């Protein structure tokens, strides 16, 4: 049950977010993982925040890049709203210390799991919108979070997803394509957590995790690319 006398474990979170909640229980809900409660958790707020974030970023890109076509704008948006980008936002906001997790989830490292942190960012976006009812205010807050990343986004082919980039990298060097295999699935559908192994000739096995097989494969491919680009 959501507490009406909720106290943040880190009061400075509000300052980092850049918004003072009138209904603090909405922020509490946005920070609460389903391992704590199947009914009172961030998943509905995440659903709302995901749509709002996509709209905010799409609107920004539409006006910032008037000469780019739909395909490139789509890739740019995907780069800015994917799990990896949201994980960086979560790190900037220092969300890991504020998550409300079950004891088991906490012990398993859930407070550092990128998928949980990314979901929480989207849930906070949904919570701010419901609390303020002000889309323009929400847009300003979200774009402030993205300031360190917007200046570095470019409409190039590098904005392809990690799996596509890894495949092109290997094909260009006439090397075998990567092999992906699911090695672990936790939870029940539709709230599962996947762990995927990625094997590339000449490199150690790399693992990626995510809320779907696709996200886990992308995470693994991103780690392989980091190794190859060193």
Curated annotation (Swiss-Prot):
The active site is at 50, 122. Keywords: Cytoplasm, Endonuclease, Hydrolase, Magnesium, Metal-binding, mRNA processing, Nuclease, RNA-binding, rRNA processing, rRNA-binding, tRNA processing. One of its GO terms (biological process) is tRNA processing. Its EC number is 3.1.26.3. Mg(2+) binds at residues 46, 119, 122. Signal peptide: none annotated. It comes from the Bacteria. Residues 10-133 form the RNase III domain. Its main location: cytoplasm. The keyword RNA-binding applies. Residues 161-230 form the DRBM domain. InterPro entries: dsRBD_dom, RNase_III, RNase_III_dom, RNase_III_sf. GO terms for molecular function: double-stranded RNA binding; metal ion binding; ribonuclease III activity; rRNA binding. Pfam families: dsrm, Ribonucleas_3_3. The keyword Metal-binding applies. It catalyses: Endonucleolytic cleavage to 5'-phosphomonoester. It is found in: Cytoplasm. Homodimer. Belongs to the ribonuclease III family. PANTHER family: RIBONUCLEASE 3 (PTHR11207:SF0), RIBONUCLEASE III (PTHR11207). Digests double-stranded RNA. Involved in the processing of primary rRNA transcript to yield the immediate precursors to the large and small rRNAs (23S and 16S). Processes some mRNAs, and tRNAs when they are encoded in the rRNA operon. Processes pre-crRNA and tracrRNA of type II CRISPR loci if present in the organism. This is Ribonuclease 3. It comes from Acinetobacter pittii (strain PHEA-2).
């Amino acid at each position: 049950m959501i507490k009406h006398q909720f106290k943040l474990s880190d009061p400075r979170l509000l300052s980092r977010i850049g918004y003072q909640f009138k209904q603090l229980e909405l922020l509490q809900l946005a920070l609460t993982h389903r391992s704590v409660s199947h009914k009172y958790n961030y998943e509905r707020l995440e659903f709302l925040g995901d749509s709002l974030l996509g709209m905010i970023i799409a609107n920004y890109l539409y006006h910032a890049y008037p000469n780019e076509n739909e395909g490139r704008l789509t890739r740019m948006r995907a780069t800015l709203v994917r799990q990896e980008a949201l994980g960086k936002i979560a790190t900037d906001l220092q969300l890991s210390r504020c998550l409300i997790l079950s004891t088991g989830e906490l012990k398993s490292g859930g407070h550092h799991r990128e998928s949980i942190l990314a979901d929480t960012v989207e849930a906070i976006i949904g919570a701010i919108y419901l609390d303020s009812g002000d889309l323009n205010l929400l847009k300003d807050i979200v774009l402030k979070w993205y300031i360190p990343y917007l200046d570095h986004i470019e409409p190039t082919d590098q904005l392809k997803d990690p799996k596509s980039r890894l495949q092109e990298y290997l094909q260009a060097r006439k090397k075998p394509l990567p092999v992906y295999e699911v090695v672990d699935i936790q939870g029940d559908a539709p709230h599962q957590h996947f762990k995927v192994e990625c094997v590339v000739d000449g490199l150690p096995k790399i693992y990626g995790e995510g809320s779907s097989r696709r996200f886990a494969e992308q995470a693994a491919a991103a780690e392989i690319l980091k190794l190859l680009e060193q």
